[in-house]
Amino acid sequence: METVQSAHEYIEHHLTFLTAGDGWFGINLDSMIMVWLTGLVFILSFRYAVTKGTKGVPGRFQCLIEIIFEFVDDIVKEIFQAKDKLIGPLALTIFVWVLLMNAVDLLPIDLIPALTSAVGVEHFRDLPSADINITMSMALGVFILVLGYTFKNKGVKGFIKELTTQPFSHPLLYPVNLVLELVTLISKPISLGLRLFGNMYAGEMIFILIALMPWWMQWALSVPWALFHILIVVLQAFIFMVLTVVYLGMAVEEH
């Protein structure tokens, strides 16, 4: 019974946020701190690559940055057909930022909580992409961008026409079209945020459960899972970035 209780307390400790405020007005400070830290790492690393880059033979870090840049640029050019100066930098920012947030999950599960406990902070969840508030906020930001691009390129009348005249062309079915299209429109940011949250939360839980096992089982299970989780970390950042570009491409696409 004592073992079960201690396991329960361990899991509860790792799943409790450092929160300021209550209810709807509460803010998960740990998630916000990690979001800003990973964002700072992104900015400083790319700034370093640009300012310290050599015109001759580039270093390893510069090569890595160039590979990421070209990778994202090729995807954007393939998906987003219109000309827009914002989409490329936006896609690069989303991919690298989400990748860095996800990569925090590859750190030892007790490392950052132990460091924060040493300075008197009892609870600190270090994986921001396992916080549904963070993932849904990012998805909401994408949704607002999609609406902005839609109104900019199609206008209010074009947007309403798009919602009411497809998939059925008969005027009597316009109300049905409106309901179907609104459901589709709203489901995009919801699925975008929940997909990232669900995958990263599940990965975090598996690491926590592995940490509860005997030390010899931890090594046998944590290394294979960490190697597999690298794929999940990269894949989820890639999916979030690609879907963002796809949705923005649909917003400027003429039907």
From Swiss-Prot:
Transmembrane segments annotated in the record for this chain: 24-44, 86-106, 131-151, 205-225, 226-246
Gene Ontology, cellular component aspect: plasma membrane; proton-transporting ATP synthase complex
Chief place where the protein resides: membrane
Subcellular location: Cell inner membrane
SUPFAM superfamilies: F1F0 ATP synthase subunit A
Bilayer topology: Multi-pass membrane protein
Family matches, as Pfam families: ATP-synt_A
GO BP, sorted A to Z: proton motive force-driven plasma membrane ATP synthesis
Keyword list, A-Z: ATP synthesis, Cell inner membrane, Cell membrane, CF(0), Hydrogen ion transport, Ion transport, Membrane, Transmembrane, Transmembrane helix, Transport
DNA-binding keyword on record: no
InterPro entries xref list: ATP_syn_F0_a_bact/chloroplast, ATP_synth_F0_asu, ATP_synth_F0_asu_AS, F0_ATP_A_sf
Listed GO MF terms: proton-transporting ATP synthase activity, rotational mechanism
Family, similarity comment: Belongs to the ATPase A chain family.
Quaternary state and interactors: F-type ATPases have 2 components, CF(1) - the catalytic core - and CF(0) - the membrane proton channel. CF(1) has five subunits: alpha(3), beta(3), gamma(1), delta(1), epsilon(1). CF(0) has three main subunits: a(1), b(2) and c(9-12). The alpha and beta chains form an alternating ring which encloses part of the gamma chain. CF(1) is attached to CF(0) by a central stalk formed by the gamma and epsilon chains, while a peripheral stalk is formed by the delta and b chains.
Function: Key component of the proton channel; it plays a direct role in the translocation of protons across the membrane.
PANTHER family xref list: ATP SYNTHASE SUBUNIT A, CHLOROPLASTIC
Protein name in UniProt: ATP synthase subunit a 2
Organism of origin: Vibrio campbellii (strain ATCC BAA-1116)
